[in-house]
Amino acid sequence: MMKFFEYNWQVRDQWFTWCHQLTTEELLKNRLGGVENILYTLFHIIDVEYSWIRAIQGKEDIAVQFADYQTLNKVKSLSNTFRTEIIDVLQTHSDQIKDELVSVPWETGVLYTRDEILHHIIAHEIHHIGQLSVWARELKLSPVSASFIGRTLKPIHSY
């Protein structure tokens, strides 16, 4: 599972680099499909990842407002800031605690295992990154490669 977090983070960082070719206006332009626009999609991925990780830790969810992150650099900085805490959770995940039950503040009376949550985080990011690829092609630009094969992944602990 760790390899998929490494993959997602590498692809996310490549999308941040890819986004530098667009203006802030283009990044914020509402589009068909997905969640509004390119910048908000990246923000949403980061926000959801962090909310689930905090739930695993038994911590209160922090409501991060997109209005405070209206530039590419601010969203990238948010991603980097949250990774520190996320790394701690990922490095302590093991087979012994993967079935530990977690409640989330946004769903009353529902429990998930740590393992389910981590798999959901991975799938959620891959899903939304796919939408970025669609929008890139609509802009007549090449998207970031989604291929897992042939990547040299940076270990989680090195972020």
UniProtKB/Swiss-Prot annotation:
Give the family, as the similarity comment puts it.
Answer: Belongs to the DinB family.
Keyword Flavoprotein found: no
What SUPFAM superfamilies does this protein map onto? DinB/YfiT-like putative metalloenzymes
User: Where does this protein come from, organism-wise?
Assistant: Bacillus subtilis (strain 168)
**Name of the gene:** yizA
Q: Name one GO molecular function term.
A: metal ion binding
Q: Which InterPro entries match?
A: DinB (IPR007837), DinB/YfiT-like (IPR034660)
Keyword terms: Metal-binding
Under what name is this protein listed? Uncharacterized protein YizA
**What residues does a divalent metal cation bind to?**
44, 124, 128
